[in-house]
């Protein structure tokens, strides 16, 4: 179905991109992308329905409000395969990609054009800690890129959940494109989760991670592994009382492996 979207376009400078992405991540704003032309760099916010221009705490030059279709929108996103982490490639189409693992993802409104540092950190930890046959929960799965990666790394049961219906829709489409046995559900944290898991990965904002940790032990098998990402430097002290096994950092973002 070729949906019609409402877009707000802003002209920005290159040095604003990181701060904008940081603000959007912390405020759970997923419906955006960036693009460049000879006229400069632009930020586009995308909405499914008619929307008033939203406030952004940046000095941005508003360019226009326009409508576009889902087919045209996808053309503005990732068009070429790229190496996501070592040995793992993301391919928006059926290209002949030479890699250990290839994930075919059509970016949707569940995330922006680039894959965030937090996603890459999560993926690197998944590759390090996941063993074939593990049961994996992806809490806040977004596009399901981590769920799909877990399955391709040899996981047994993989469940991806997200509270955003747009993310769930995009995740299901991506699972189908990759022809993997991954279950996707809509869920507010653990509200629609059953069973126990050897590994739980969650790439969401720090405050929600702290909230999730209250119930997480009920869903973790003995000696299970927990991967937490989406933690900006200023929020890292929130996790000081947890048993941190490993800590990786990229730019201002942190990912932790903890044992409970």
Swiss-Prot record:
PANTHER family: ELECTRON TRANSFER FLAVOPROTEIN BETA SUBUNIT LYSINE METHYLTRANSFERASE. It comes from Thermosipho africanus (strain TCF52B). S-adenosyl-L-methionine binds at residues 119, 140, 162, 203. Its EC number is 2.1.1.-. It comes from the Bacteria. Methylates ribosomal protein L11. Keywords: Cytoplasm, Methyltransferase, S-adenosyl-L-methionine, Transferase. This is Ribosomal protein L11 methyltransferase. GO terms for cellular component: cytoplasm. InterPro entries: Ribosomal_L11_MeTrfase_PrmA, Ribosomal_PrmA_MeTrfase, SAM-dependent_MTases_sf. It is an enzyme of class 2 (transferase).
């Amino acid at each position: 179905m070729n949906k019609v979207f409402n877009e707000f376009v802003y002209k920005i400078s290159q040095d604003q991109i990181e701060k904008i992405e940081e603000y959007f991540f912390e405020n759970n704003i997923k419906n955006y992308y960036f693009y460049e032309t000879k006229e400069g760099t632009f930020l586009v916010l995308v909405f499914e329905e008619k929307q008033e221009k939203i406030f952004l705490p940046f000095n941005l030059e508003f360019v226009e409000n326009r409508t576009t279709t889902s087919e045209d929108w996808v053309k503005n996103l990732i068009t070429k395969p790229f190496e996501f982490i070592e040995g793992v490639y993301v391919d928006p189409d059926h290209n002949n990609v030479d890699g250990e693992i290839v994930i075919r993802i059509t970016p949707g409104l569940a995330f922006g054009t680039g894959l965030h540092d937090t996603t890459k950190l999560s993926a690197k930890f998944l590759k390090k800690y996941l063993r074939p046959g593990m049961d994996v929960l992806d809490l806040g799965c977004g596009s399901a890129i981590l769920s799909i990666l877990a399955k391709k790394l040899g996981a047994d049961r993989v469940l991806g959940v997200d509270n955003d219906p747009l993310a769930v829709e995009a995740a299901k489409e991506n699972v189908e494109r990759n022809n993997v046995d991954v279950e996707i559900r809509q869920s507010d944290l653990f509200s629609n989760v059953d069973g126990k898991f050897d590994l739980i990965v969650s790439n969401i904002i720090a405050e929600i991670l702290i909230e999730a940790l209250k119930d997480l032990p009920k869903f973790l098998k003995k000696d299970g592994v927990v991967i937490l990402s989406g933690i900006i430097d200023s929020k890292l002290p929130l996790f000081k009382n947890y048993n941190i096994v490993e800590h990786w950092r990229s730019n201002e973002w942190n990912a932790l492996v903890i044992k409970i």
